[in-house]
Structures are given as C-alpha cells and as structure tokens.
C-alpha cells in the first residue's frame, strides 16, 4: 500500500506523497494509512484558516524529513499531494516507518 501512496516525481525532482490532513490535532505527527482513500494521514495542530495548516505542514515536513516541500495539489483541501524536494523514495519510506507506521 505504501508504494501506491509514495512515488517518484517525473518533473519536480523529488518524491510525491498523497496525504490526508487532520487539522486541530494535539500534536503534529504522521498517522496511519487510510487504505480506502490510499493516503497517509498527517496530523497537524493548526487549523485550516488563512493557510496556517499548509504552513504548519511545510514546517513539519522540514523537521521530519529535512527537506522542503511543494504542495502540488489540494492547496485548499484536506487531501493533498506533496512533493518532498530532493528526497529519495527509500529515504521517505524509512522515515515514515520509523515515525509511526
């Protein structure tokens, strides 16, 4: 399942991750995989108001993976596709597995 959610980007020089954002969480963390939607759940403390959740997502990914991100799709949706710039698929999968799944 994780190989369907995480894939190499052809034009962004990074790794694409399909995520579902759960805002207003107690802490920022990687959650489980939503198998029905085929998305990795990311829990974020910020509310989705005025782009605050998207900024929090960028900070969280920078802290977790040490890489910058681009929100490729879903800027105003809880379902997003994120590109982790300069990362490898194995690197991302290893860090996700170590963090929670």
UniProtKB/Swiss-Prot annotation:
GO cellular component term, pick one: cytoplasm
Which Gene3D superfamilies does this UniProt record tie to the protein? YggU-like
The chain's disulfide connectivity reads none
Looking up InterPro entries in the UniProt record yields: DUF167, YggU-like_sf
User: Belongs to which family?
Assistant: Belongs to the UPF0235 family.
HAMAP family with a match to the protein in the record: UPF0235
Identification of the protein by name: UPF0235 protein Maeo_0841
